[in-house]
Each structure stands twice: as C-alpha cells, then as structure tokens.
Regions:
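Catalytic cores of alpha/beta
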Residues: 32, 71-86, 115-127, 159-166, ...
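Short secondary-structure boundary segments
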Residues: 19, 45, 92, 113-115, ...
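Alpha-helix-loop-beta-strand connector modules within alpha/beta enzyme cores
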Residues: 54-73, 94, 99-116, 145-171, ...
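Glycine/Thr-rich beta-alpha phosphate-binding loop at enzyme active sites
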Residues: 82-92, 111-158, 195-203
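Structural preference for beta-strand elements that scaffold enzyme active sites
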Residues: 12-14, 38-42, 68-72, 86-89, ...
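Catalytic domains of carbohydrate-active enzymes, especially glycoside hydrolases
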Residues: 29-44, 126
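Active-site mouth loops of central-metabolism enzymes
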Residues: 9-27, 108-115, 165-166, 170
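Glycine-rich phosphate-binding active-site loops on the catalytic face of alpha/beta enzymes
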Residues: 15, 90-100, 132-144, 175-208
Length: 208
C-alpha cells in the first residue's frame, strides 16, 4: 500500500465518473481536475461495451495524465490492463485481488469493504492499496445496501495505515466531517456531475 501513501492533503478527492459520458463531459473534467483537488479519477461505466469504454478511457486517460491524477478503472481488470491505467477498483463480487495482480502487477488495486472490518482485514492481508468504505450517506449514484459510520472509520484506522476512501452521497453539507475524522480520500460523483445548482467546476471549488 505504499504507492499512494505520499498523498497530498489538498488532493483529497477520489472522483468517480458519471454513469453516462455526455459530450460536454471532457471539457468539464478538465475544468474540475484543474482545481488540483483530485488524486484519483475512476471510470465507472456499467452499460458500455468494452470497445466503447476503451475509446472513452483513452480520452480520459490523457486528461488525467495532464493534471497528474491517477486513472483507475472500476471492476474491469482487462480494461485496466489494455489501457495501462494506474489501477483498478474491485468490488467484493469482482475478480479476486491475486488474480488481478497477475494481470496488472504492481498497479494500484483498491477494494470495496462496504461496512465490514472483516472484509477490510482480508483486503489488507491481500495487500490492497486502498480500502473503500461506505455508504456514509444516502447516495443518488448507487442503491445503498450497506451503511457505514464514523465509528467504523475509526476502527479501520486503528488496524491499518492503508489509505481509506469513504464513499456514498458525499456533498458540500457532509464532506467536512469525514475530513475531520481523517478519511484519506472522499469518493464523490453525484455532487459534481448531477448538481442542479452548480456547474462541475464550481461544485468542486466549494470543497476546501
């Protein structure tokens, strides 16, 4: 997990893509990453073909490189390998970490741990590069099956110094509390991409 321990406190955002890539997305992404608050960008497209994800992925990867943001692929280790992305995020039902390592070697592999210390311990044992816990709040991006709490975050911090990503409905009204409780990265999607009041770049500017 040493790859990302040298993180920059100002870059606390782990940005997740909208579920559909519209044509103004690329311009918005540049404006968002330009704010220098993002450490990771995760491409999470459930409905596109491999080929389409490859085309979109290449465009996004260029933008991420320009702004020194790590480019992570959700679920699809083969896509991560093909794109030579910086890493892959695996859910509990996705490919196992050992299999993923065979494909992408020393790249970043993050693991969804829901609200479970037991899952976190397994991920730590398997040398995950970061642990993702959630949902901390109700989310518009994903149905909430697991509810995570600040006490869970504190427990996880006691057992590991592997970076922790917190996820689930994070927005301007609740992000500060997670930072104060020393979450390393905040996974954010809907607040940036589906904000009815603010453009993406203005939404991210408010998070300081």
């Amino acid at each position: 997990g040493q790859k990302i321990l040298r993180y920059n406190k100002k870059r606390f955002i782990y940005l997740i893509s909208p579920s559909k890539i519209e044509k103004n997305f690329f311009k918005n992404l540049k404006e968002v990453l330009k704010q220098k608050k993002t450490s990771f960008f995760q491409l999470r497209l459930k409905k596109n073909s491999f080929k389409k994800k490859l085309i979109i992925g290449r465009k996004i990867q260029k933008i991420c490189k320009k702004f020194k943001v790590k480019f992570i692929i959700n679920d699809d280790v083969y896509l991560a390998k093909k794109l030579n992305a910086d890493g892959c995020h695996l859910g509990q039902s996705d490919m196992k970490i050992r299999e993923a390592r065979k494909l992408i070697g020393k790249k970043i592999i993050g693991i969804t741990c829901h609200n479970s210390i037991k899952l976190a311990k397994t991920a730590i044992k398997n040398k995950a590069d970061y642990l993702a816990f959630g949902a901390f709040n109700l989310s518009k991006t994903k149905k909430v099956k697991y509810k995570a709490s600040i006490s869970l975050l504190k427990k996880a911090q006691k057992i590991t110094n592997t970076p922790i990503v917190v996820i689930g409905g994070i927005n301007f009204n609740n992000y500060k509390n997670l930072l104060l409780n020393k979450a390393n990265f905040l996974a954010i999607s809907g607040y940036i991409w589906k904000n009815k009041k603010l453009k993406p770049k203005n939404a991210i500017k408010k998070l300081i």
